[in-house]
Design a protein with these regions (language model features):
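Conserved Rossmann-fold NAD(P)-dependent oxidoreductase catalytic core, especially the SDR/UDP-sugar
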Residues: 37, 91-96, 102-149, 163
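Substrate-positioning beta->alpha
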Residues: 99-100, 153, 171, 197-208, ...
């Protein structure tokens, strides 16, 4: 971990800045002294604090990433497929079914021209080979709902980055929750029914990764919080 006094401000581009994890990325990066540029869709409400540069545009549109990447050092991506009713796994998709994959292709094509080599993206626990680490009921839910579309897209995103030659990392969080930071984040080997992590903790982990000077070696770590939530509080938790 980089010491507070040793950390130098970076120029960061945040994709998906208006979403749950994206808003935390912007907020925490600003608190840590970084310079943030947020790419946000034209019609999406987004009112960040002072000092955040906002570019309006669609990530898949020609020329948008060229504008957004100018002068940046690292990309933080919180992009992913959205469902019309986020808490309902069977809800219809509200995003293109290959949003993250297509955005990754655009990044791979565009980043080298701007001298940007590092990207840290959000994937999901259970993507790719980590499906073996999922509880059987979670595997069933993913396979028999529209969550499967998100997982196919994120697997495609990871594959694009894997063949890019970039310094990339795709973090695979367990179930995302609302809530304050815990600071008890760890790489986990099992994704159970009650495994969870707050969006704030995911954002903090991504920023810490982006600040490391050494190249990434572990490309797709699965992360969660330490300890287990009691069964009663797990069922009574608010929907994310």
């Amino acid at each position: 971990m980089i010491r507070e006094l040793d950390r130098k401000p970076m120029n960061l581009l945040v994709l998906g800045a208006s979403g749950g994890c994206g808003q935390w990325l912007v907020r925490l990066a600003r608190e840590r002294g970084h310079h943030i540029r947020a790419l946000v869709r034209p019609a999406t409400p987004f009112n960040p604090s002072a000092g955040i540069e906002v570019i309006r545009g669609e990530v898949l549109e020609e020329g948008v990433l060229d504008r957004a990447l100018e002068g940046c050092e690292t990309v933080l991506s919180a992009l992913g497929i959205q469902r019309k009713t986020p808490w309902n796994p069977w809800s219809a998709l509200a995003s293109p079914p290959d949003l993250a994959t297509q955005a990754a292709r655009r990044l791979v094509e565009t980043m080298p021209g701007h001298g940007v080599r590092r990207v840290v993206a959000i994937s999901a626990g259970g993507v790719g080979e980590s499906v073996r680490q999922l509880h059987p009921l979670l595997r069933w839910l993913i396979a028999h709902s529209n969550v499967a579309a998100s997982y196919r897209d994120l697997e495609g995103m990871e594959a694009v980055f894997a063949g890019s030659g970039l310094d990339w990392l795709a973090v695979r969080p367990t179930t995302l929750r609302a809530g304050p930071p815990t600071g008890t984040i760890q790489v986990v080997q099992h994704f159970g029914l009650f495994s969870h992590i707050s969006r704030c903790d995911v954002a903090a982990w991504m920023l810490a990764a982006a600040e490391r000077p050494e190249p990434f070696t572990e490309r797709t770590p699965m992360i969660g919080t330490t300890g287990r939530r009691r069964r009663k509080s797990a069922w009574s938790a608010k929907r994310p």
